[in-house]
């Protein structure tokens, strides 16, 4: 079962992970990307959590990919109903945007 999603949150990655579990989102399969707003604003880093049979891996985007991160931010900022309210979490499902997912991941 492939369940792709992108989560943008002011929480830390650990807090976001716990929050998503509490919301009942299945994290045992597929790929989940969590962006920490503080990391994006400071370093344009992307925190990726790869969930699957290989276990849990957290990695950070390298500097040469910062332009790609900027493009992603620009794309997401134009999305409707985008809100970065206090301690709010925005979950975007890309079920119909596999080409976008391929570029992002």
From Swiss-Prot:
Keywords: Signal. It comes from the Eukaryota. Residues 1-24 form the signal peptide. Partially overlaps RAV2. This is Putative uncharacterized protein YDR203W. It comes from Saccharomyces cerevisiae (strain ATCC 204508 / S288c) (Baker's yeast).
């Amino acid at each position: 079962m492939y369940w792709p999603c992108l989560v943008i949150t002011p929480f830390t990655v650990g807090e976001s992970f716990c929050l998503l579990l509490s919301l009942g989102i299945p994290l045992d399969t597929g790929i989940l990307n969590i962006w920490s707003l503080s990391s994006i604003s400071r370093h344009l880093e992307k925190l990726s959590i790869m969930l699957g049979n290989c276990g849990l891996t957290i990695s950070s985007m390298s500097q040469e990919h910062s332009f790609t991160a900027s493009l992603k931010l620009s794309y997401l900022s134009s999305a409707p109903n985008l809100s970065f309210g206090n301690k709010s979490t925005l979950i975007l499902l890309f079920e119909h945007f596999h080409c976008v997912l391929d570029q992002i991941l």
